[in-house]
Amino acid sequence: MGQFLIQGGCQLKGEVTISGAKNAALPILFASLLSKGNVNLTNVPLLKDISTTLELLKELGAEASQDGHEVHINASSVKNYTASYELVRSMRASILALGPLVARFGEADISLPGGCAIGARPVNLHIHGLEQMGAIIKVQNGFIKARVNGRLKGAHLYMDMVSVTGTGNLMMAAALAEGVTTIENAAKEPELVDLANFINGMGGKISGAGTDTLTIEGVESLGDCSYQVQPDRIETGTFLVAGVVSGGKVKCLKTAPHLLTAVLSKLEEAGAAVTTGSDWIEVDMIDRQLKSVNISTAPHPAFPTDMQAQFTVLNTVAPGTGRIKENIFENRFMHVPELQRMGANIILEGNLAICGDPDPLCGAEVMATDLRASASLVIAGLIAEGETIVDEIYHIDRGYEAIENKLIALGAKIKRIEN
């Protein structure tokens, strides 16, 4: 599975180029199933989840290839509408094949998804929305089986809870539905704005992306599109936190400051000097005093759950008491016991992590349990005394492109060990 061997005590300095956003690229890849033409994407990150998705598209009958950060897809010859357990089990995003397949082909069998073990992430929102649009859906034998005679029909949909994947799936399905669909209480994440812009680039008619009400005027078909995936705001935030807790100075290039308003505000509150340009962000912590901060995760534009683990590390080494409340996912403090093995002073009370006055972190062997937790353990290893080994790093490869190479360029002492 591989390990990272990290020598602690480094101060990160320099520039790092941010990759395309995994959480934008994945739904865009699935949305390419809606098109009868050629789709060319740029700024696609080189990640395990991306290659898994391309394999799934090929299994369905599409042409799909990646050359560096460019991806070409042609789904005109799709003949198979079943997403098998073999590919779906490692990646929850596979549920995003459901909407496009049933919208374009009237049929989809999607194995119930796997992926990060951080909570229920229910699929009932996807199912209920598609049923309101006319699909007949059964869940049996580990599959979601959806059928519709003719085209899906536009409908007025209300999301019982804010769901990024649910909003994305129904947006894609509605793009080829007959009539107008409105989605109320829609998720507002930037990655969904990217998805809507991509679908519109293929000829779709979606308005309201980035607000809580989407209006989708269905079209009969979608065609060619060339599109650049937006930068990864979570990778950006991760490197910024690493720079801050190491007492260094890090500049993230090819990123988008407007996507990180809540995170940048908390970094300033933590004592960092934050400077931004049109496509770059720099944090400077040299000769500055780190401070603990209180965090409460919530849907965009509030503080993102995907940055919670990284700020937990920040609070463990900052003076004072910092409280982190996780409101999005249950079971998303699996990094805490691993940080405690390194000496972190953290008390868990339900969905609240209370980080007390710091003791120095000491290197230890720790296990990555999910994507963002693994990033927090790498950050902790960079600032701990001595040597840290992070096991099960396949989690981090799902969402961070060549993270060790980027950290080494900033002065980190980190090595990948394959076993």
From Swiss-Prot:
GO BP: cell division; cell wall organization; peptidoglycan biosynthetic process; regulation of cell shape; UDP-N-acetylgalactosamine biosynthetic process
Stored Pfam families: EPSP_synthase
Catalytic activity reported: phosphoenolpyruvate + UDP-N-acetyl-alpha-D-glucosamine = UDP-N-acetyl-3-O-(1-carboxyvinyl)-alpha-D-glucosamine + phosphate
Record: residues binding phosphoenolpyruvate: K22, N23
InterPro entries: Enolpyruvate_Tfrase_dom (IPR001986), Enolpyruvate_Tfrase_sf (IPR036968), MurA_subfamily (IPR050068), RNA3'P_cycl/enolpyr_Trfase_a/b (IPR013792), UDP_GlcNAc_COvinyl_MurA (IPR005750)
Pathway(s) of this molecule: Cell wall biogenesis; peptidoglycan biosynthesis
Gene Ontology terms: cellular component: cytoplasm
Binding site for UDP-N-acetyl-alpha-D-glucosamine: R92, D306, I328
EC identifiers of the protein: 2.5.1.7
Keyword Disulfide bond: no
Principal place of residence: cytoplasm
Catalytic-site annotation from UniProt: C116 (proton donor)
A GO MF label: UDP-N-acetylglucosamine 1-carboxyvinyltransferase activity
Subcellular location: Cytoplasm
2-(S-cysteinyl)pyruvic acid O-phosphothioketal PTM positions: C116
Record keywords, A-Z: Cell cycle, Cell division, Cell shape, Cell wall biogenesis/degradation, Cytoplasm, Peptidoglycan synthesis, Pyruvate, Transferase
Top-level taxon of origin: Bacteria
HAMAP family hit by this protein: MurA
Protein task: Cell wall formation. Adds enolpyruvyl to UDP-N-acetylglucosamine.
Family: Belongs to the EPSP synthase family. MurA subfamily.
Protein name: UDP-N-acetylglucosamine 1-carboxyvinyltransferase
Organism, scientific name: Psychromonas ingrahamii (strain DSM 17664 / CCUG 51855 / 37)
